[in-house]
Regions:
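Short, well-ordered coil/turn elements that cap or connect secondary structure elements
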Residues: 23, 80-82, 104-105
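ATP-binding Walker
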Residues: 12
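P-loop (Walker A) phosphate-binding loop of NTP-binding proteins
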Residues: 9, 21
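ATP-dependent small-molecule kinase phosphotransfer cores
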Residues: 27-86, 90-98, 134-135
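A glycine- and Lys/Arg-enriched "phosphate-lid" helix/loop adjacent to the NTP-binding pocket
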Residues: 48-53, 98-137
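Conserved beta-strand scaffold positions in the cores of enzyme catalytic domains, especially
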Residues: 23-28, 109
Length: 137
């Protein structure tokens, strides 16, 4: 089964690519969902500051590949079920290294790119809890 990892700046359009993949029957694993789950598990508000603090705190404590490592079990289950899998939101070389070690050449990486102006406009429109405001962007 095909395995694609998306990467790109916030609001570049990764979610749109993931939505199209899902409409075509692909399983989508959004790495950010793990961060949201951990934030909620700790009893923290799903707000940009707390989500960011959890994400970065775990990276500092366990290494920058921590969220990719924690994704492997879910991705493996999706693949075992026979699904093509799209990984939404891979960040940085350490996460790529985790996925390359686990999946080798079966992993295809795709960068989604949009201008800063376009990304800011999307952030202001979509109102996602982890986006923050224009000043944070």
């Amino acid at each position: 089964m095909t395995l694609i990892a998306l990467t790109g700046m916030p609001a570049a359009g990764k979610g749109e690519v993931a939505a199209v993949a899902q409409q075509r029957g692909w399983a989508v694993h959004r790495i950010g969902d793990l961060v949201w789950e951990e934030t909620e598990r700790r009893g923290l508000e799903l707000a940009p500051a707390s989500v960011g603090a959890v994400a970065n705190g775990e990276r500092e404590a366990h290494g920058y590949g921590v969220w990719a490592s924690r994704s492997l079990e879910r991705i493996d289950a999706l693949r075992a079920a026979g699904s093509h899998v799209l990984i939404d939101g891979m960040r940085g070389e350490r996460e790529l290294a985790v996925f390359r070690t686990a999946y080798g050449d079966a992993l295809v990486t795709v960068a989604v790119v949009a201008s800063a102006e376009q990304r800011l406009a999307r952030v202001q429109q979509r109102g996602r809890i982890d986006d923050g405001d224009a000043a944070a962007f």
